[in-house]
């Protein structure tokens, strides 16, 4: 499931490292986390929706790859991301 444009803009604004930043790993992880949360809520009512579940697994995998990249570059940023978005590791 996608997120509304205004919600996406809000997520970008709160997680951007500088003005106009949409591509940093922090912003990408935040957007993916928002989409993952939306899909998780969707699965509470639509338990048998296996096609969307596959999409959820792809999103989680992409977020994991981005987090691994951040961890390799800067451990402090990685820990801050985990803390901010309540991601288990």
UniProtKB/Swiss-Prot annotation:
Cystine pairs: none
Any single Pfam family the record assigns to this protein: Ribosomal_S15
Keyword Ribosomal protein set for record: yes
InterPro entries cross-referenced by the UniProt entry: Ribosomal_uS15, Ribosomal_uS15_bac-type, uS15_NS1_RNA-bd_sf
GO molecular function: rRNA binding; structural constituent of ribosome
Composition bias type Basic and acidic residues, residue spans: 1-21
Keywords: Ribonucleoprotein, Ribosomal protein, RNA-binding, rRNA-binding
Region (Disordered): 1-24
Keyword Transit peptide tagged: no
GO CC annotations on file: cytosolic small ribosomal subunit
Record-level GO BP terms: translation
Task performed by this protein: One of the primary rRNA binding proteins, it binds directly to 16S rRNA where it helps nucleate assembly of the platform of the 30S subunit by binding and bridging several RNA helices of the 16S rRNA. Forms an intersubunit bridge (bridge B4) with the 23S rRNA of the 50S subunit in the ribosome.
Quaternary context: Part of the 30S ribosomal subunit. Forms a bridge to the 50S subunit in the 70S ribosome, contacting the 23S rRNA.
Protein family according to the UniProt entry: Belongs to the universal ribosomal protein uS15 family.
Entry-linked NCBIfam families: S15_bact
Designated name of the protein: Small ribosomal subunit protein uS15
Species of provenance: Rhodopseudomonas palustris (strain BisA53)
Gene of this entry: rpsO
């Amino acid at each position: 499931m996608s997120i509304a444009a205004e919600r996406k803009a809000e997520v970008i604004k709160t997680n951007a490292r500088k003005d106009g930043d949409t591509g940093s790993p922090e912003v990408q992880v935040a957007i993916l986390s928002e989409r993952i949360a939306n899909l998780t809520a969707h699965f509470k009512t639509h338990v048998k929706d296996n096609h969307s579940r596959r999409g959820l697994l792809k999103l989680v995998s992409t977020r994991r790859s981005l987090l691994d990249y951040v961890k390799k570059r800067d451990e402090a940023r990685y820990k801050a991301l985990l803390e901010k978005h309540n991601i288990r590791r």
